[in-house]
Amino acid sequence: MDKTREQLLQRYEELQQAKAKVEKDLLKIPGVAAVSVGLKETNDSYTDEMCLRVYVEKKKPAKEIPEGELIPRRINNFLIDVNEIPKDVTGSAAFKPDYGKYRPLTGGIAIKSARSKQFGTLGCMVLDVAEGEVFLLTNFHVLLTNGEEKGHDVGQPDFCCEPCPCRCGEIARIERWGDWDTDNVDCAIALLTSDQQNNWNNDVLELGPIRSIRLDDTGTPVHRVRPNDTVFKRGFSSGRTEGIVIDPTAPITVGFHTKNGDVFKSFTDQILSKIKYRKSLF
């Protein structure tokens, strides 16, 4: 019988308390990289059973692991699910990318920096309340892995409509970004050009308007994503996808294409989901 969201949330809180008690000991086991709470996976399929998720670089058969280094199947009646740290290379989607030109600007469309041959996805627009200026929000790896600097141009989808040498696709200039070496975020913003400051909307293509996040008195979101929640995404290469959250605080290793080859970076506290539906772009 499928569990209700209330039942899953109750179990989630119980497991969070259990994790706080056992995480330190689990991390002492050789090969264990992280511990979190999420859904149990079986044969690459998710279930609605909540568990402690233990992440390792590489899973091994039990017979190859010294007895003192085996990860227990349960701790205090809480199920443990051992998983390899997810790895992904951006731009590896097997879908036909959407290189369409969109005006007004909106989330979920293709953009690229002047120095890059790779395209990425525009996430949404953000407002600098103090200055009244509008920026586009995207990933560091989309705009800054080819030697780009502040002030370098961003195009949508590209800069010129070949074969003419115009710059009609220029929409923004790189402004600032998360510290690639120390931050646990993959983000960057670019200031919209003067002709685009009022040529945008607060939507994500195929998903609709972005709604505000309500915070409590401590600044914590009132509604936070939890295991088994349904989430949606629209990427320029993946199209519109619908997925189920497996783990809202997972470690993930991501590979990015650069002019010097693929570069891999590890992140923690990331939302890990499984796609259950993908809408074709064409």
Question: Each PLM stretch: what is its role?
Answer:
Residues M1-V126, V134:
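Noncatalytic regulatory segments and standalone regulatory/sensor domains
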Residues N76, D262-K265, S280:
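Short non-domain terminal segments
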Residues F95-I275:
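Serine endopeptidase catalytic core focused on the charge-relay Asp
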Residues K276-F282:
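Extracellular low-complexity, Gly/Ser/Thr-rich intrinsically disordered linkers
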